[in-house]
Amino acid sequence: MNAPPSRLKFHTDTDLAKGLKALFVELQARLELRDKPIKATIAGGIAVHLYTAQRVTMDVDAEFGARLYLPQDLGIEVPGPGGRSLWLHFDAQYNSTFALMHEDYLDDAVRVPLGVDYFDIYILSPVDLAVSKISRLSANDRGDIAALVEHGLTTAAAIEARARDALPGFVGNVRPLEMNIADAVEIARQAEKRRSTA
């Protein structure tokens, strides 16, 4: 199960989301973009934030549909927790091939109406976003998977099925990955229980 795009609600009115829009606006100004919009697909914590409004992050994991130069000094200051400022910036080292990704992740990404003229901005679907967290499965990744499930955006069964479908395309040793899948599915199941009793 994955929430259909028509039912998805995006939190585009938060300080972090407004900062994300400003970051893309600044990038298109720096690059002097004037042609048709370039597709940008966002993963990571900022995508989780757009779905849940819970996650706070400073780096933007974005994959572009064209080769772009990302200025190293490009960033936007946004209010963060406790009144401290965050420097929101693109992660120039982001590479989706390091994560577990289903072969259809770009096709199934969901458009976010941020209102940026020369970027067509998408985020990973909830289930693909959860699956992308599995290869590393840090504390933040675990929390992100739980948050997506607790918000009713995906399920343990959907995550397991999508992750197993993605395994043949993973570059590297899949044995640790299979253990991570089992852990991620258990995290999702526990989140489902919390959701059902909330």
Show which residues each predicted segment covers.
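Compositionally biased terminal segments of proteins
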Residues: 1-198
